[in-house]
Amino acid sequence: MKTLQMTLSNKKNNFIPYIMAGDHEKGLEGLKETIQLLEQAGSSAIEIGVPFSDPVADGPVIEQAGLRALARNVSLSSILETLKTIDTKVPLVIMTYFNPVYQFGIEKFVAALEKTPVKGLIIPDLPKEHEDYIKPFINDKDICLVPLVSLTTPLSRQKELVADAEGFIYAVAINGVTGKENAYSNQLDQHLKALSSLTDVPVLTGFGISTLSDVDRFNKVSSGVIVGSKIVRDLHEGKENEVIKFIENAINF
Amino acid sequence: MTYNQPNNKGFYGQFGGQFVPETLMTAVKQLEEAYVDSKKDPLFQAELKELLKDYVGRENPLYYAKRLTEYAGGAKIYLKREDLNHTGAHKINNALGQVLLAKKMGKNKVIAETGAGQHGVASATAAALFGMECTIYMGEEDVKRQSLNVFRMELLGAKVHSVTDGSRVLKDAVNAALRAWVAQVEDTHYVMGSVLGPHPFPQIVRDYQAVIGQEARAQFLEKENKLPDALVACVGGGSNSMGLFYPFVNDESVAMYGVEAAGLGIDTPHHAATITKGRPGVLHGTLMDVLQDENGQMLEAFSISAGLDYPGIGPEHSYFNAVGRAKYVDITDEEALEGFKILSRTEGIIPALESSHAIAYAVKLAKELGADKSMIVCLSGRGDKDVVQVKERLEAEKEVKK
């Protein structure tokens, strides 16, 4: 079993924060201290966002963070260089749109990842149909391509998606972009429970999670949560203590 | 060998595909199924055909532009008169087809992106005709540049959503429309306006626009008893050009020229010459040639014509370029303005600024080809929407000269 899945399988109430690489007053120089802060607060893994000019799966908070990073000339290549210098015990997961990776070169990208603590990839615009762009290069590496399952994914397809899933399964909790709040359907808990029952791979819930009661709700029906926009907003506003407190509370339910 | 693209995964050679979030996968698969069914459904085809005839006014003429031909001094120039369609451009061919498809899928709401507003107007028109709720996403900059089209869409009962993200033009309107589609995918159809986006959109839009080339081919054969030597059409996303080109794809003797917008010049940063200056990348759900920086971030496109102001080009055009089936050339803002004036004066037809790019290139090409040759130019839209913009520009130029 690859490291990412092992780490998340071993516990309940997993918490994965998302940060945008380079969205820091020190630019990429600040990435190390943010990762340390999130690690010490008790994160199970940390999602590192790569900025993209056209982030169609993201809401305004993450889009703006990406634009701030791009304004600091942050690129996939400079992020990889920075990650090489970072030492952390928690697995990192890169969240990127496909084009920056495609331009960088897929083989070269995977080779660069091996020199970093990155153990997983989330590529929201690379559906199962196109996983062959990446999968053959990571099959024998300690890197997982995390599948997303949405509320619109029919049961037959859910089964296909989880069949050879590695790392964890990213359950998208709303039909919408990241950071959209208070839109959860009544059937969501049942959907998450049913999805978890299809597989031994941990299911983590994300999109729109911003309160401890959301966290509590999804910890009951899945293996944990991914929190992006709230973390990105708080860090941007200098509320590090608020982030630490939130994570500490989230993992202690 | 008979042309047979895309393949069953929605690829044209290396281009195309379905690079969309999982939330949209079910919708694009459902669309693919509904589209395949509709092709075999005689009632659907009959309804679309009747609408194209009685509502759009097809078939429209293939017109021999005698005075433009004389002006150019070379090959005979025929114009395919898409400007005479209801709503004034080729966009209605596709909008009607897709709104019918939406109805077939039981979806009662449609959304669409628009740049210059022509596709927005066409979608709002089709939605009005079927009593559907319609929201149009348009970049804030374009809302300002094309306020008359905004008013038209509102008259037709559509809601126009001004997009304030990014550079506030067509690319950003597509982002906003895709996000809106994700949020309401279960009851809403996204009417893609060009041969762009995830499969099956590039194929659907091509097939609905192919009526342009089908008519033009038959009309030309009837008038000249042979095939034309060349086809010329402007290319932004590439729907009018693909509509003209596709029915000729197996006619090897027919050369195809896609005219991209060179803006202020392809050696400046201000152009929309995607094939000439771009390289393959993934944007808005498809792998195609795009204008991007070394790190894969999209660049802003620039053109005097809002309808060509897009940093990508349909995947099938990228394929045509890669295999050499079509040639892609550039016309600057200045040259397009000249084309706008020339067609107005020689033929009494005011072309859209988009189509003016095709006219300007046709004049050059006619000279090169010589008098015994002939070509069809797609006059994709009429220029009424651009008259104010051109007037302001020409007046400003006069001021500078004084």
Curated annotation (Swiss-Prot), chain A:
SUPFAM superfamilies: Ribulose-phoshate binding barrel. The keyword Amino-acid biosynthesis applies. The active site is at E47, D58. It catalyses: (1S,2R)-1-C-(indol-3-yl)glycerol 3-phosphate + L-serine = D-glyceraldehyde 3-phosphate + L-tryptophan + H2O. Pathway: Amino-acid biosynthesis; L-tryptophan biosynthesis; L-tryptophan from chorismate: step 5/5. GO terms for cellular component: cytosol. GO terms for molecular function: tryptophan synthase activity. PROSITE patterns: TRP_SYNTHASE_ALPHA (PS00167). Pfam families: Trp_syntA. Its EC number is 4.2.1.20. InterPro entries: Aldolase_TIM, RibuloseP-bd_barrel, Trp_synthase_alpha_AS, Trp_synthase_suA. Keywords: Amino-acid biosynthesis, Aromatic amino acid biosynthesis, Lyase, Tryptophan biosynthesis. HAMAP family: Trp_synth_alpha. Tetramer of two alpha and two beta chains. The alpha subunit is responsible for the aldol cleavage of indoleglycerol phosphate to indole and glyceraldehyde 3-phosphate. Belongs to the TrpA family. This is Tryptophan synthase alpha chain. The gene is trpA.
UniProtKB/Swiss-Prot annotation, chain B:
It catalyses: (1S,2R)-1-C-(indol-3-yl)glycerol 3-phosphate + L-serine = D-glyceraldehyde 3-phosphate + L-tryptophan + H2O. GO terms for cellular component: cytoplasm. Its EC number is 4.2.1.20. InterPro entries: Trp_synth_b_CS, Trp_synth_beta, Trp_synth_beta/beta-like, TrpB-like_PALP, TrpB-like_PALP_sf. The modification N6-(pyridoxal phosphate)lysine is found at K91. Keywords: Amino-acid biosynthesis, Aromatic amino acid biosynthesis, Lyase, Pyridoxal phosphate, Tryptophan biosynthesis. Belongs to the TrpB family. NCBIfam families: trpB. This is Tryptophan synthase beta chain. The gene is trpB.
